[in-house]
Curated annotation (Swiss-Prot):
The keyword S-adenosyl-L-methionine applies. It comes from the Bacteria. Specifically methylates the N4 position of cytidine in position 1402 (C1402) of 16S rRNA. It is found in: Cytoplasm. It comes from Pseudarthrobacter chlorophenolicus (strain ATCC 700700 / DSM 12829 / CIP 107037 / JCM 12360 / KCTC 9906 / NCIMB 13794 / A6). Its EC number is 2.1.1.199. InterPro entries: RsmH (IPR002903), SAM-dep_MeTrfase_MraW_recog (IPR023397), SAM-dependent_MTases_sf (IPR029063). This is Ribosomal RNA small subunit methyltransferase H. It is an enzyme of class 2 (transferase). GO terms for cellular component: cytoplasm. GO terms for biological process: rRNA base methylation. Pfam families: Methyltransf_5. GO terms for molecular function: rRNA (cytosine-N4-)-methyltransferase activity. Belongs to the methyltransferase superfamily. RsmH family. The gene is rsmH.
Length: 330
């Protein structure tokens, strides 16, 4: 008899799990040296794989898990139940870190992990509409309790707006053709499923483009997902907020999955790792000194073994930094 497929939470292999933990660990040590119990934020909790590994390894660690996806939060809660005395799980978007910490009475943290993009749970749950590989309602919301859906976007945005988001968020060179086709098709019948959208995209993207760019709908789906969830706007607010929350010696680790995400992460971390002294200033005052020390040379990527275990990790790019000076005054 064939075994039934394991639930997504059991199949899930956390991306770069050991490397993430090893990068965060010195931040926990720094807290202990200051006589404090270490506190870490998993800002994109997902199914809790990274968090579970950290809680198992560090018995004194307190975890704050944040996720906008209520289903993921519930599954992670079950997974992390043995550690419930050392966890706070919060339904929020990760740019709300300052509010979450204020509500919990936490003033600073020892580390923060961000694993960006769409989760395995969201990709595997057909009805969520994130995947172009099977037909499903055209939704794509990470938080299904609020906000516009992907169907709302493709059925209501004008052609110029569609071109803009598909080109900007999807980096799709056929954005004009795709937007034009979407507008024409919805005039006959509004889009309701992913399959309908994939069919229209296939009709205008040259077959040869798939050889180098993957599935013809890949970039458009990425663009719609980013638009629906305001992912890059959230990220631009979240990374600075995360850095501001770090205690001395605390560390931030971020995994991104496409160049738009990585560009934002790189900009913030590198910007905060440089002197802010005005050009030509004769001395570097304390408040001008770098706040962060970069811990990774460029980006780190998964090994071939890790990719074999989890093919979705192939595009992961990791950056990390450590706080070496108190936050800048506003």
């Amino acid at each position: 008899m064939n075994e039934q497929p394991k639930p997504t939470s059991e199949r899930h292999v956390p991306v770069l799990r050991d490397r993430c933990i090893n990068l965060l660990a010195p931040g926990f040590d720094a807290a202990r040296q200051q006589g404090k119990a270490p506190i870490v934020i998993d800002a994109t909790l997902g199914m809790g794989g990274h968090s579970e590994a950290m809680l198992q390894r560090f018995p004194d660690l307190h975890l704050i898990g944040i996720d906008r996806d209520e289903e993921a939060l519930a599954l992670a809660g079950e997974r992390l139940a043995p550690f419930s005395a050392r966890t706070d799980l919060v339904h929020a978007v990760y740019d709300e870190i300052p509010e979450v910490l204020a509500d919990l009475g936490v003033t600073e943290i020892s580390g923060i992990l961000m694993d960006l993009g769409v989760s395995s749970l969201q990709l595997d749950e057909r009805e969520r509409g994130f995947a172009y590989s099977f037909d499903a309602p055209l939704d794509m919301r990470m938080d299904t309790s609020r906000g516009q859906t992907a169907a709302d976007v493709v059925n209501t945005y004008n052609e110029e707006e569609l071109v803009r988001i598909i080109r900007k968020w999807g980096e799709e060179k056929f954005a004009g053709r795709i937007a034009n086709r979407i507008v024409a098709a919805r005039g006959e019948k509004p889009f309701t499923t992913t399959g309908e959208l994939v069919e229209q995209i296939r009709s205008v993207v040259p077959a040869g483009a798939a050889k180098s760019g993957g599935h013809p709908a890949k970039r458009t789906f990425q663009a719609l997902r980013i638009e629906v969830n305001e992912e890059l706007d959230v990220l631009e607010r979240a990374v600075p907020a995360a850095v501001d929350a770090l205690a001395m010696g605390g560390r931030i680790v971020v995994m991104s999955y496409h160049s738009l995400e990585d560009k934002i992460v790189k900009s913030v971390l590198q910007g905060r790792s440089k002197s802010s002294a005005p050009l030509g200033f004769p001395v570097e005052l304390e408040e001008h000194k770098p706040e962060l020390k970069i811990l990774t040379k460029g980006t780190e990527v998964p090994t071939a073994v890790e990719i074999a275990e989890n093919p979705r990790a192939a595009s992961a790019r990791l950056r990390a930094a450590e706080r070496i000076r108190a936050r800048r005054a506003a």
